[in-house]
UniProtKB/Swiss-Prot annotation:
Note describing how the cofactor binds: Binds 1 zinc ion per subunit.
Coiled coil start-end: none
Family: Belongs to the AccD/PCCB family.
GO CC, any one term: acetyl-CoA carboxylase complex
Domain of life: Bacteria
Pathway: Lipid metabolism; malonyl-CoA biosynthesis; malonyl-CoA from acetyl-CoA: step 1/1
The protein's Enzyme Commission number: 2.1.3.15
Cofactor or coenzyme needed: Zn(2+)
Pfam family, one: Zn_ribbon_ACC
Protein name: Acetyl-coenzyme A carboxylase carboxyl transferase subunit beta
Organism, scientific name: Pelotomaculum thermopropionicum (strain DSM 13744 / JCM 10971 / SI)
Family matches, as HAMAP family: AcetylCoA_CT_beta
Quaternary structure annotation from Swiss-Prot or TrEMBL: Acetyl-CoA carboxylase is a heterohexamer composed of biotin carboxyl carrier protein (AccB), biotin carboxylase (AccC) and two subunits each of ACCase subunit alpha (AccA) and ACCase subunit beta (AccD).
Keywords: ATP-binding, Cytoplasm, Fatty acid biosynthesis, Fatty acid metabolism, Lipid biosynthesis, Lipid metabolism, Metal-binding, Nucleotide-binding, Transferase, Zinc, Zinc-finger
Length: 283
């Protein structure tokens, strides 16, 4: 009995049954700016704006339209226009096919007639998922036709820009779209119609140097990258350090290139108010 007190007790370790639950892909999203882990449903409810730091995630064209126009009012224009391979580059067609499959779009821009809080407008939305929304012949043609439709129907034109610039696979033909879209906007202005340009992240290259900069009212989303060449390219060229926030929406507003910075949750309301003022002025 006494020896039993000094004997080492024998224990059986029982491992609890634990089922490792796999979290379905896409339930949580990490903020690119602050690193916060966000519940995707909550992020979507907040217009894809980070609830902690206000970072604006990029949107697809379909998401942008759903957030901006009245439900069921969007009627797409020129959906059948498809890009071709003018210089027979070996990889271009496969890149187009891949972009169509991954985005559900035929090109990097959606155009259509819609209503915003009941106010009619022609709406253009670029989608950076499609080859960084580079501007080729079809993108330029669709934007030109949208401007012409706005002029013919005496409706305001709203363009949401997002682009990496001209589409290099279409060479000089892509650069010609800069002049083409600008000419169409000039004709729209002659008709006395309002053109609102909304700059989203990123708006660069030939798009920033053409139609995106020509709005009667230029709006930008917070933190959007806006400029012709990227900051790194400029720094390497001039061999100087650029100011903090250079080419961001806030910097451009301070220097007069942007009229308004509008957070995404207030975008529809702001556009409706501007359309209302314009229509009152026409009466």
């Amino acid at each position: 009995m006494i020896l039993d007190l000094f004997r080492k007790q024998k224990y059986i370790t029982v491992q609890p049954e634990s089922e490792t639950r796999e979290i379905p892909e896409g339930v949580w999203v990490k903020c690119e700016r602050c690193g916060e882990i966000l519940f995707k449903k909550e992020l979507d409810k907040n217009y894809k704006v980070c609830l902690k730091c206000g970072f604006h995630f990029r949107l697809s064209a379909f998401e942008r339209i759903a957030m901006t126009v009245d439900e069921g009012s969007f009627k797409e224009l020129d959906a059948a226009l498809l890009p071709v391979n003018p210089f027979n580059l070996p990889d271009y067609e496969s890149k187009l096919v891949s972009a169509r499959q991954s985005t559900g779009l035929n090109e990097a821009v959606l155009t259509g007639e819609a209503a915003i809080e009941g106010y009619p407008a022609v709406v253009v939305v670029m989608d950076a998922r499609f080859m960084m929304a580079s501007m080729g012949t079809v993108v330029g043609e669709k934007i030109t036709r949208a401007a012409e439709a706005a002029a013919a129907g005496r409706r305001p034109l709203i363009i949401f820009s997002a682009s990496g610039g001209a589409r290099m696979q279409e060479g000089i033909l892509s650069l010609m779209q800069m002049a083409k879209t600008v000419a169409a906007l000039a004709r729209l202005g002659e008709e006395g119609q309002l053109y609102i340009s909304v700059l989203t992240d990123p708006t660069t290259g030939g798009v920033s140097a053409s139609f995106a900069a020509l709005g009667d009212i230029v709006i930008a989303e917070p933190g959007a990258l806006i400029g012709f060449a990227g900051p790194r390219v400029i720094e390497q060229t001039i061999r100087q350090k650029l100011p903090e926030g250079f080419q961001r929406a806030e910097f451009l507003k301070q220097h007069g290139f942007v009229d308004m910075i509008v957070p995404r949750p207030q975008m529809k309301e702001t556009l409706a108010r501007l359309l209302d003022l314009h229509l009152r002025g026409e009466k």
